[in-house]
């Protein structure tokens, strides 16, 4: 995996998220099933019984109870008549101007935002630990066992967080599938971040982690070389450390080459979906629902 391509995907994902969470909500005037929230319509009835008698004298009792209609994602309806009429037209729900109560249907709210927050915290901790260790080594102090253990834990947590974020987004989509099959805007946002976390996890395990481990080994060799009194042996260790730090890990194979081109091609995804949602918001074309 090539670093710059992954970084471009990450930048595009952040930009697209800002667009979806800010401009997109402002752009949409229609609160039908294309908005970022999730609600369902629930008719508010009092429980009543109506008794009727047919021609044969049979008495029939009809009980009217509160009825929940199928999920109808909207932004914030809150009993607004215009909003509920749009929901009625899209989903075929007949509310007939009865009182409407809107309640959330999502089991997991904003999985993409949760993922961004968790990954950001873990990356921040990882960067702080690495910078602290590098500064410690540059100052002439050896890295302690605790520091190396802490770096190892953060390396493991970073990969686990990236891989777990993909699983979390998939589970959230499955859990709220009735909502996401109608609200493609939120679905697109979640799928996009799941894709980004996936390529970050692959890039991390195949490129970033080996490179970082190699750099740390090179720095440790330099520190050890300074403690060796034999000048020739110390020089050899410094040369080895320099080579270890700068030589490529391995020549890219066929899989890496194909993956690089596919990731480059996938960069077109971000402008394509942005143009699509702008067109939907401005009413230039109907959403795909």
Swiss-Prot record:
Parts of the chain that traverse the membrane: 1-21, 112-132, 151-171, 189-209, 261-281
Domain of life per record: Viruses
Keywords attached to this entry: Host membrane, Membrane, Transmembrane, Transmembrane helix
Name the UniProt record assigns to this protein: Putative transmembrane protein ORF111
KW Aminoacyl-tRNA synthetase (keyword) present: no
GO cellular component: host cell membrane; membrane
Disulfide bridge map: none
Cellular location(s): Host membrane
Main location: host cell
Membrane topology summary: Multi-pass membrane protein
Source organism of this protein record: Ostreid herpesvirus 1 (isolate France)
